[in-house]
Amino acid sequence: MDQTLSNFGTVFVFLVLGIVFVVGGYLTARMLRPSRPNEEKLSTYECGEPAVGSAWVKFNIRFYVVALIFIIFDVEVVFLYPWATVFKQLGMFALVEVLIFAGILVLGLVYAWVKGDLDWVRPTPNIPKMPELPKRHSSGRSNG
């Protein structure tokens, strides 16, 4: 019990020191740096070239979907690495657990693939058009 508290205490101390280090560095830099904003400093910087257009560019939503899928599988690798280092000690039960974990992620990938989220150019849907009604011809008489 004391060993567990000691381990958590170590993690807590490192967490607090990390937060103090980041906040302290931020506050120190904010107090010591000069703040002289002008028009040139507040303008958009594009590699030394004059800015063209707005800085707000619309990106295709497909970039977001691809990035999310990449992050999901990147995190999967992060979870698999510790398992792979102790695989022989954990035995068959851990192998089954990892296969279930990977299977769930593969099912998610297949679902995204079947749904068409991985297709960059989506086919346009074939929407049937309404048939045109025959035009009525007036008999030349007016209703007035």
UniProtKB/Swiss-Prot annotation:
InterPro entries: NAD(P)H_OxRDtase_bac/plastid, NADH_UbQ/plastoQ_OxRdtase_su3, NDAH_ubi_oxred_su3_sf
Main location: membrane
Catalytic reactions of this protein: a quinone + NADH + 5 H(+)(in) = a quinol + NAD(+) + 4 H(+)(out)
NAD in keyword set: yes
Transmembrane segments: 8-28, 63-83, 90-110
Cellular compartments annotated: Cell inner membrane
Membrane topology recorded in Swiss-Prot or TrEMBL: Multi-pass membrane protein
Alphabetical UniProt keywords: Cell inner membrane, Cell membrane, Membrane, NAD, Quinone, Translocase, Transmembrane, Transmembrane helix, Transport
EC number(s) stated in the UniProt entry for this protein: 7.1.1.-
Gene Ontology molecular function, alphabetical: NADH dehydrogenase (ubiquinone) activity; NADH:ubiquinone reductase (non-electrogenic) activity; quinone binding
One Pfam family named in its UniProt record: Oxidored_q4
GO cellular component terms given for this protein: NADH dehydrogenase complex; plasma membrane
Similarity comment: Belongs to the complex I subunit 3 family.
Task performed by this protein: NDH-1 shuttles electrons from NADH, via FMN and iron-sulfur (Fe-S) centers, to quinones in the respiratory chain. The immediate electron acceptor for the enzyme in this species is believed to be a menaquinone. Couples the redox reaction to proton translocation (for every two electrons transferred, four hydrogen ions are translocated across the cytoplasmic membrane), and thus conserves the redox energy in a proton gradient.
SUBUNIT field: NDH-1 is composed of 14 different subunits. Subunits NuoA, H, J, K, L, M, N constitute the membrane sector of the complex.
Protein name per its UniProtKB record: NADH-quinone oxidoreductase subunit A
Provenance organism: Chlorobaculum parvum (strain DSM 263 / NCIMB 8327) (Chlorobium vibrioforme subsp. thiosulfatophilum)
UniProt lineage: Bacteria, Pseudomonadati, Chlorobiota, Chlorobiia, Chlorobiales
